[in-house]
Amino acid sequence: MNLKSPTVTVEKTQQEVFDFLMKVENFEQLMPESKQKFEKLNDVRFLFQLKGMPEIVLEHKESTEHSSVILGAASEKLPFTLTADIIDTGDNKCTTQLVFEGKFNAMMGMMIKKPIQNFINTLSENIGNL
């Protein structure tokens, strides 16, 4: 399953957005209002839970300086990655798009597609409001 958020313009430099996303505790500011739990587990890992959903642990998997931050599920039960692509547009601005990639069976994919799309759209909108 491959889902993409709309591309948003951020009134911050590419470096500022990259630095923000490299700190896992900052993801709490990006979470939807339906967030029930958020906990920083260490410098590269955090746990969150949205209303009606199970707890999910995300961790930094890799990054490309200034342009990409990749988070992934810490559990192999639901293998997925969430990539933030950050593109410099000049004038101290950048654009950001989130890309979700997961390996799920067809039934699971049908059940989670809409909630995940809504989730990454909200994260993206909130990045745009930084």
Model-derived regions: residue spans:
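Glycine-rich portal/gate segments that line the openings of hydrophobic small-molecule binding cavities
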Residues: 29, 38-77
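Hydrophobic ligand-binding cavity/cleft-lining segments
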Residues: 1-39, 45
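Generic structural detector for well-ordered beta-strands
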Residues: 7-11, 47-49, 59, 85
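Intrinsic-disorder/low-complexity, polar/charged segments enriched in Ser/Thr/Lys/Arg/Asp/Glu/Gln
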Residues: 2-7, 45, 55, 68, ...
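A short, structured loop/turn motif at beta-sheet edges
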Residues: 14, 61-66, 86-95
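Structured loop/turn residues at secondary-structure junctions
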Residues: 9, 13, 61-63, 74, ...
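Amphipathic alpha-helical hairpins
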Residues: 2, 8, 30, 69, ...
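Beta-strand/loop substructures that line and gate deep hydrophobic ligand-binding cavities in soluble
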Residues: 74-125
